[in-house]
């Protein structure tokens, strides 16, 4: 990177620059019908350069990638092209972070294992979950990743972080008398916990059997709806995104600081904190792509918006202290225990739709469990919809918590006044 640094510093048109360097080392296992077919390791490095150009009271920027084979002559051409593109962008002026340096590691017990050993332990946990007759894991792929990320800019910032993650992709299959049913599963984690891995795969194997057995209800259902962690991550994530600096700057936010999100609450109060790190989350980071150190900030307290959050650029635009692009969301647990009585537990959706402006929440259900009188009936071919403001006012949140990607919070939520059709 020395040559490109020298060329950028020597170019009077360039007002600033930033390097984002991402080195990724992976170890991968590929299984077909329980048999290990392929073992692969990779080592890649992406080097992205951002060029900033101040012009006419504005700041423009443009990016390009460089490779080990990129020559000095090619670098000059890339810089010239980037300057030309940046001159076409009229962003409000802002400053880059400055004079922060350091090397960091995101906490993970992956560092305690050799890659091959860890991959083998994960595979053992995955296949030990297969204890349902006529069910199998048709295909399993395991990816272990070690990321080394560096941010350097023209104002003296120079930071490096190391973080780890793993992904298991599996095709659980159930072979019934009438047909064979397959589901797709992607499980991401950054802490080695064999029991958690086994439970995750076992739940999906149970789900594929249930999907085979699922029926479409003959009569409309009328009962509370229970959402699990994936849908709750989408619900709370929609609220958090509305309070992001970028949304506020664009006047695209519905909620305002100091105003209630739950206007007439009768359920559990909603609390949301945005943070840089959550134990076990694959999105945890010590700093963002601008190099800003990531802490935490309370967004929602007792159902009321109390802060905004966001990137260096948009924080400066709003006159707020930049928090950085915080990747993790922690939602407060509630007081609800295990749901009782008659209710519909959502297992899989085509995607939860949350429309803040149209006061809507709903979506198509691929698989759900209908609980009634101690019996559980797998159902499919139905949808749910409701008034978002009513749902937020009456929501009951579980005291048990779960982690899903960048989310940590209630494992379940009970929604009333939902239409099932």
Regions found by a protein language model. Give the residues of each.
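Dual-mode signal for accessory low-complexity, basic/Gly-rich regions
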Residues: 260-421
């Amino acid at each position: 990177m020395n040559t490109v640094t020298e060329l950028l510093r020597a170019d009077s048109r360039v007002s600033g620059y930033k390097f984002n360097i991402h080195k990724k080392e992976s170890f991968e296992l590929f299984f077909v019908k329980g048999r290990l077919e392929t073992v692969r390791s990779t080592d890649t490095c992406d080097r992205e350069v951002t060029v900033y150009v101040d012009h006419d009271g504005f700041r423009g920027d443009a990016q390009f990638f460089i490779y080990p084979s990129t020559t000095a002559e090619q670098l000059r051409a890339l810089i010239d092209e980037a300057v030309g593109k940046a001159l076409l962008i009229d962003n409000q002026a802002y400053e880059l972070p400055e004079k922060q340096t350091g090397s960091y590691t995101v906490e993970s017990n992956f560092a305690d294992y050799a890659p091959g050993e860890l991959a083998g332990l994960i595979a053992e946990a995955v296949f030990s979950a297969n204890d349902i007759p006529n069910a199998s894991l048709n295909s399993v792929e395991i990816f272990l990743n070690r990321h080394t990320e560096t941010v350097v800019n023209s104002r003296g910032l120079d930071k490096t972080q190391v973080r780890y993650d793993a992904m298991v992709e599996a095709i659980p299959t159930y072979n019934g008398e009438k047909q064979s049913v397959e589901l797709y599963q992607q499980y991401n984690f950054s802490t080695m916990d064999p029991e958690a891995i086994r439970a995750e795969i076992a739940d999906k194997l149970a789900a594929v059997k249930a999907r085979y057995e699922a029926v479409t209800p003959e009569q409309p259902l009328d009962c509370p709806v229970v959402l699990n962690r994936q849908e709750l991550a989408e619900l709370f994530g929609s609220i958090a995104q509305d309070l992001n600096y970028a949304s506020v700057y664009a006047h695209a936010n519905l909620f305002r600081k100091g105003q209630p999100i739950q206007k007439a609450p009768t359920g559990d109060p909603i609390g949301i904190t945005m943070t840089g790190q959550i134990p076990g989350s694959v999105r945890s980071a010590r700093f963002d792509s601008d190099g800003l150190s990531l802490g935490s900030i309370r967004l929602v307290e007792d159902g009321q918006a109390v802060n905004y959050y966001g990137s260096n650029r948009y924080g400066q635009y709003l006159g707020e202290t930049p928090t950085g692009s915080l990747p993790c969301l922690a939602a407060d647990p509630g007081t609800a225990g295990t749901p009782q009585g008659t209710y519909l537990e959502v297992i899989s959706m085509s995607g939860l739709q949350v429309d803040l402006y149209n006061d809507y929440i709903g979506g198509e259900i691929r698989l759900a469990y209908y609980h009634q009188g101690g019996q559980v009936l797998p159902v499919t071919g139905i949808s749910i919809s409701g008034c978002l403001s009513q749902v937020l006012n009456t929501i009951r949140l579980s005291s048990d918590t779960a982690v899903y990607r960048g989310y940590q919070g209630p494992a379940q939520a009970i929604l009333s006044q939902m239409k099932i059709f």
